[in-house]
Each structure stands twice: as structure tokens, then as C-alpha cells.
Amino acid sequence: MEKVKIIGGGLAGSEAAWQLAKRKIPVEIYEMRPVVTTPVHKTEYLAELVCSNSFKSTELTNASGLLKEEMKKLDSLLLRVAEETRVPAGVALAVDRELFAKRVQEILLESPYVTVIREEVKKIPEEGIVIVATGPLTSSDFAEHLIEILDTDSLYFYDAVSPIIYADSINYEKVFSASRYGKGEEAYLNCPMTKEEYERFVEELVNAETVESHYPGEEKFFEGCLPIEVLARRGIDTLRYGPMKPVGLIDPKTGKEPYAVVQLRPENIQKTLYSMVGFQTRLKFQEQRRIFRMIPGLENAEFARYGVMHRNTYFYAPKFLKPTLQFIKNERVFFAGQLIGVEGYMESAAMGIVAGINAARLYKGKPLIILPPTTMIGALISYVTTKVPVKQFQPMNANWGILLPLERPVKDKKLRNRLLAERALRDLDDVIRRFAINV
């Protein structure tokens, strides 16, 4: 019996293996550890957590909570084990990291359909169904292979992501729409600053707390893309001659160029999300919230995701992936996890679930599933498979802004989120029933 090969035994690879094994399809998981190590892994367990031990909120009124509820409906192995190895963390789901990874590995190895092979894979196998889930620390040899089958410009080795803000938390009385020199559509929202506001802002940036790196030598990846706090330390005017330059932008309230400007760019067609242009940062999340709320118009800003800069291997998925997570150039190959441009433990694991389900369906000659963008998992897949300009593509986590909006707008945020969650679970139940996914 031909075996499905999974390259990478992290969160996505483990979930994919579970989905195949439970359907009695033989699987080989290729995990390079401990033969080839990484700077951050401490054990040889599958599904090892290398950063936080938290999987975020479990509440349905939180986007992370909805994502987990959808994963449960699709029989997530990781969430089942997370409940077994849970540690107190309020409404968040946090785990004993070593017990968690150990138990995931035990369950997979107990299956007669799972074999774990401890060796580095340097190329995608030429035959059979394959799921690639090599993660943010993809080995250099396999990364070279990815460059060959993708192209040099489509593979990235670090994240430099600006914060993303919910549109409905912006104070539109203080911002204005305009593109520089009036060229093209008024695509950007502009937050104007006075000299006093700008200088206070820069002072806070200079003295803010930053995140320490998990990865040795990580800073060398960022030489061509400096964090705004580093730019701020180079001189009081550096930012306003860089990402905060006001040239070509006229504030309609004054008829003049502001002293400095923070530009916000739409992140999606619905314009429910805006990113802060040029604001890649390594500030701690609480510092981002505090300091960026000093910007006029962002006093009550709610963040769909915070800015991050860290080591991360991912590719420009919209050019290469179908909504089934199949590789456009070779449909027997699936991709999953952080490699395709999702951000976060559960987001990566969810991609593994879908890749595993669809690999199983391909194996059995059944039609593959595409989850609707009204579901959180479907919306994440839609995000990483919908073409946008290459420079605008950046890893995304679960948030309400990527879901299709409700047919009728709802102003109350809690009610809106609850209605979005109810619709998502209803639509997912419909797909599960129609395709007999859990049978």
C-alpha cells in the first residue's frame, strides 16, 4: 500500500498525519531532528513548541477561540492533547510544553498507520502524495530546493510585519484619505502629526521595551529592513524623512503638509483592516499598543495583529497554491503550516488539518474540500491563496477582519463577533455534513 509522505513533524505535520491515520491511510513522517538540529528545539519530540506555551483564547467571541472551535469540529489531535496537558491560564489555553509534545508523539506512534523516519529530506519526493510542512526553520538544503521549484523572489527567510489595525477602531475625524502628490486613488489613510506630537512619539519609541530574539544571529536578517525604533534612535528627524515623511500629502483641514504622517494601507478588499506602512518593529506588544495609540486617529486602535520581526521561512503562496492547499504545478503535493504564510501555532496546525483531509480525499479518489471564507480556517486559506501584490503579502493570524463581513452591518462589536462565529460554525457544519468529512 502506497504511503503518504509528510515532510516535517511540527504542528501542521502532526495534524496532517492524524487526519490520514484516522482514515486508515499509511503515513511516513520525515522529521530531521535529532539528526539535524535547530537553534531553538530542545527535544526530538514531534509538535514541539519552541516559543510560548499558550494557544491563546478559548472564548468564541475571540477570533482565536473561533479558530479552535472549528479545529475541534474537524477532530484536531493537538487540541485534544492540549486539554489533557493544560495548565492554568485564565481563558487562554496553555499547556505543559514537554508533556504536550511527548503525548502527541505517543498517540501518533501508537497508530499502526504512522511511521516516523528521522532524516533530513532535501527534495520533494518525485512520486506519491506529499505534504510539505517544514515550518519556519526549514533546513537550508530544502530551502534551496524550494527556490528551484518556486523562484528566488517568492521565498522569504524572515518576517518584517507592520501592525494591522481594525478599520472600525480608527477615528476618521482625525485622519484624511490621500495618495502622495494626489496620484492614483486616495488609497491611504493618513494620520497627521504636529511637531510636538511627533517629538513626543519619537521619544517614547527610543525608550520603549523590545523583544529579545529566540534565534541566535537573527539580527543579521534585518539589515535591509530596520525596525522603526532603531530608525528613531538614529536621530530625531530620521523617521519624518523615512516612513513618516509628509511630502506630497496635504491635510485638507490646514491646506498644508503636516509635520509628519503615519500612513495606513488597506489590507483587504473590504477595507476592514489597515496596516501601518513602514512600521515593522520589535517592540513588545504592550508597548506597541501604548505608543501607537499616541498617533492622532489611533487613540482607540484595536490591533488585529501586532508588528513582528523574526526568523521565518515562508513563500508567496497566492502564486503557487490552490484553495485545497495543493501545489499548482503538481497537484499531488500539498503545503501546510507557517511555510504558506499563516502566523501562529493554531493557524499552522489548522492548515495541517485541511492538508491532511484533502490528501486523504485525493488518496481515495474523493472530491477535495474548499472551506468557505465565512469560516476562520477558510478565511486564512483564502488569504494565503488570493493574489495580492507580492510586497503586500505578509503572514497572517486569525482575526475578525479576514472573515467575509455580515450581510447586514452590526455596530456592537461583541454582538458582531458572536454572529460571525455562529455563521462560521454553521457553515462549517454544512461542509462537514455534505462531504461526510468526519466519516
UniProtKB/Swiss-Prot annotation:
Which cellular compartments is it found in? Cytoplasm
The Swiss-Prot or TrEMBL record lists the needed cofactor(s) as: FAD
Sequence positions that bind FAD: 8-13
Task: Using the UniProt record, name the top-level EC class of this enzyme in a single word.
Answer: transferase
Instruction: Please list the disulfide bridges.
Output: none
Q: Which InterPro entries does the protein's record reference? A: FAD/NAD-bd_sf, MnmG-rel, MnmG-rel_CS, MnmG_N, TrmFO
- Reaction(s) catalysed by this chain's protein: uridine(54) in tRNA + (6R)-5,10-methylene-5,6,7,8-tetrahydrofolate + NADH + H(+) = 5-methyluridine(54) in tRNA + (6S)-5,6,7,8-tetrahydrofolate + NAD(+); uridine(54) in tRNA + (6R)-5,10-methylene-5,6,7,8-tetrahydrofolate + NADPH + H(+) = 5-methyluridine(54) in tRNA + (6S)-5,6,7,8-tetrahydrofolate + NADP(+)
Query: Does the record's keyword annotation contain Cytoplasm?
Result: yes
Major localization listed first in the record, in broad terms: cytoplasm
Q: Which Pfam families match?
A: GIDA
What Gene Ontology cellular component terms go with this record? cytosol
EC number from the UniProt entry: 2.1.1.74
What keywords would UniProt list here?
Answer: Cytoplasm, FAD, Flavoprotein, Methyltransferase, NAD, NADP, Transferase, tRNA processing
- Please give the Gene Ontology molecular function terms for this protein: flavin adenine dinucleotide binding; tRNA (uracil(54)-C5)-methyltransferase activity, 5,10-methylenetetrahydrofolate-dependent
Q: What are its GO biological-process terms?
A: tRNA methylation; tRNA wobble uridine modification
Name the HAMAP family for this protein: TrmFO
What is the recorded function of this protein according to its Swiss-Prot or TrEMBL entry? Catalyzes the folate-dependent formation of 5-methyl-uridine at position 54 (M-5-U54) in all tRNAs.
Identify this protein by name. Answer: Methylenetetrahydrofolate--tRNA-(uracil-5-)-methyltransferase TrmFO
Question: What organism does the record attribute this protein to?
Answer: Dictyoglomus thermophilum (strain ATCC 35947 / DSM 3960 / H-6-12)
Source species taxonomy: Bacteria, Pseudomonadati, Dictyoglomota, Dictyoglomia, Dictyoglomales
Q: Which gene encodes it?
A: trmFO
